[in-house]
A protein has these predicted regions:
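Charge-dense, low-complexity intrinsically disordered segments
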Residues: 12, 35, 59, 79, ...
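Amphipathic alpha-helical binding modules
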Residues: 71-111
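Charged, amphipathic alpha-helical oligomerization/scaffolding segments
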Residues: 17-20, 24, 47-50, 67, ...
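Amphipathic alpha-helical interaction modules
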Residues: 28-74
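Short terminal alpha-helical segments
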Residues: 2-39, 93-101
């Protein structure tokens, strides 16, 4: 016997997409064993972009997170020589954390 209500059913596509994200992260880690160190931050940014894409596809799209995903896509699709990757990572991380903090502040006001 389990306690609490059963978890909500998940969409098979979401499960597959999460597994594919895990495979991407694992293959990225493996690739980094032989790739130049500078590839690591770009692969992490692409992993974040893929995770945010899952939210857009399977969740309730959040305009602020969609903008972050689009910033990452624009950086990843262009010439990486033109991208200030440290600044992009710092800025987009701050933007994602701002969304989380705003959500939590809103949820605590409802209690």
């Amino acid at each position: 016997m389990t306690s609490g209500p059963p978890p909500p059913p998940r969409q098979p596509d979401l499960d597959d997409d999460i597994v594919l994200l895990a495979a991407f992260l694992l293959s990225s880690g493996h690739g980094l064993l032989d790739e130049p160190p500078a590839y690591g931050p770009a692969r992490c940014a692409d992993g974040a972009r893929r995770a945010l894409e899952l939210l857009d596809t399977h969740g309730t799209p959040d305009p602020a997170l969609t903008r972050v995903r689009e910033q990452l896509e624009n950086a990843m699709c262009g010439s990486m020589a033109d991208v200030d990757l440290p600044s992009l990572l710092r800025t987009t991380c701050d933007q994602v954390l701002d969304v989380v903090m705003a959500r939590r502040a809103g949820a605590s006001r409802l209690l």
